[in-house]
Amino acid sequence: MNYSSNWALRLLTIFLIIGAFNITNAQNLKGVVTDTSGALLENVGIFNQTSGQHSHTNLSGLFSLPSSQINDSIYFSNLGYKTFVLVVNQNHLSEGVEVILEESSINLDQVVVVSKVDAMSRIVNVDIQNDPVKSSQEILRKVPGLLIGQHAGGGKAEQIFLRGFDIDHGTDVAISVDGMPVNMVSHAHGQGYADLHFVIPETIDNINFGKGPYYADKGDFNTAGFVDLNLKKSIDKSMLSYEAGQFNTNRFVGLFNILESSKSDAYIASELYLTDGPFHSPQNFNRINILGRYHYKDIGKEELTLTASHFQSKWDASGQIPQRAIDQGIIGRFGAIDDTEGGQTSRTNLMLNHTKFLGEDQFLKTRAFVSKYDFELFSNFTFFLEDPVNGDQIRQYEDRTIMGAETIFEQIDIPVGTDDRFKYSAGLGFRHDNVDDVSLAHTLNRKTILEQYAFGDIDETNIYSFINGEYTTGNWTFNPSVRLDYFKFDYENKLSEAYDNKSESKAIVSPKLNTIYTFNRNWQMFLKTGLGFHSNDARVVTANEGQEILPKAYGLDLGTIIKPTDKMVLNATLWGLLLNQEFVYVGDAGIVEPSGKTRRVGVELGGRYQLSDWLYLYSDVNYTYARSTEEADGEDYIPLAPDFTAVGGLSITDLGNFSGNLNYRYLGDRAANEDNSIVAEGYFVTDLNLNYEIKNWTIGLIVENLFDTEWNETQFATESRLFNETASVEEIHFTPGTPFYLRGKVAVTF
């Protein structure tokens, strides 16, 4: 008995000693990450290969990695830098560590798949760095499964397709630039109108995106997803670029580094774009952009970015044409029934982004913005259906001022026990839109107003708050969050002889929960669930006296991201989205239409492969089943909802002096009306981009639609009547896609 007791006591003592040894030797590894010039690197991925713990550098390049022991292998990864592996020694644990990353070409070796809710954004940014975009709207195509189409002379915001939504110009996807919203509430042309043309593509640094209503810091318009573009805080070199090509196309771009010091940077960017397009009636398109940006950073204390920009454009358009007009030989594919369509628009922005460092792991982020915006658009979709003498041209107009602000407190590293970590953020903000003279009118030749269909002033305010938590224990990460939105809608009908102002308000709570399981640094699985809401127009809300102001959206994603080798990344997602009853304001007709409840389910597959240091391949395939749940079978199609899409390509970088890209996009046939009796034809289009560098000079070749495919960029089932017709016809009306389009480019950096 005594011998057994003594043995048991000795064994217990040994276990306690081992446990105490592990506790005292499993420590926080702290340090800083910089590049070779000493610049601090933010958001560097850090992974302990031995323990499975992971972290990221903060805004000051600092990091803390729990459960680190001597001889652990720590991986440091960041896009554009060689992956660095640190073997921990006692000095690292007691004194901290400074990690210096060397710059290199972008490749998949630098991607670590850990428990990040936005892990796909980091992967897609490899695509962007390997294939720089040629327009600000084009960057939206970098979001897997998102396609766009232009149908009004290049000046309108593009039509967007994502996850079984014909999003029109932005109704169900929240788009922002450095946190400043792009979508326009209660817009003259339609809810959520998102014109990104005020962004100069050469100033884009990276893109952050997410699909579904799973993100507490995103509210209005975040149904199918969100996209946030981040602009460069500074530029390394100044640059001049000139581009010329078919259809009288000319584009001038200049980026000028005007200030560079230890704490401050500033640059100015400008763009002038001119083209007539491939249409028989010249588009006479012109766009001017100018941007100025100042960045100040006092390490460990504060960071400030001030941005001012102005954009304006003007254009003519040939509009959407009916197939029968081509079949009868009245016009060609690039002709027009009414070539007096077109418009003009402008936007001026002032932005402030400020971060106050309250401590090593605490930040207070504040951003504020004000925008002045105007819009005028002339369209004719039905030709002579309503007015057989003067035609059906309409004018949509508005004059808008937007202002908003947001403050977020972040605590990014709170120890919970020995290994677990918790972080959270809490935010409060508002947005206010003052829209004057928003109108829809029947016009003649852009000169004469024949009748006002709608005319009024809109004031809309959104006040919101949210709290977002993230708890990591072992291989699990739990991300619960909740958002509160309050909306106030006011619409004054100025067509009424008496004062006619209607007002409604509504609040909604949107909880979300994302769960991630990380097998290792190269494999994660995730389950995302969330409640959101479908954005609504003030004219819808007041017309329906507050009924179904903010119809709920219920979302669920189940998926995985895996790196089977250092050179390959694969992803797969099953998802579903249910939308409650919604009312839609049809800006082209000035009427309110109910669209009923809808259900969308789908699967997304993607792959990226770094075949060599200079060759990169990628592809994304998406299938969606989208139906109305309140209609009979066969009559429950959602018009223009895409069911099968695919994008992909290959990129060549640093092959001697050469670089280039070959990309494709595919959109399958889809129903254009509720019973699928009218079909919008799909397309497969390929683009090519080649560059040759000589010292600080770059000579480039850009080819859109390499194989000169005949395709329809945007399509609608529309009832119209031509001047010589006695009865109307409903059929596909479309804007033809760009034919073979060749441009040359020369750029110099200095």
Protein language model features and the residues they cover:
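Transmembrane beta-barrel wall of Gram-negative outer-membrane proteins
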Residues: 241-274, 279-318, 342-359
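Short, acidic, small-residue-rich periplasmic hinge/interaction motif at the N-terminus
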Residues: 44-49, 77-81, 92-130, 137, ...
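Short acidic/polar hinge/loop motifs at secondary-structure boundaries
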Residues: 64-66, 181-211, 230, 545
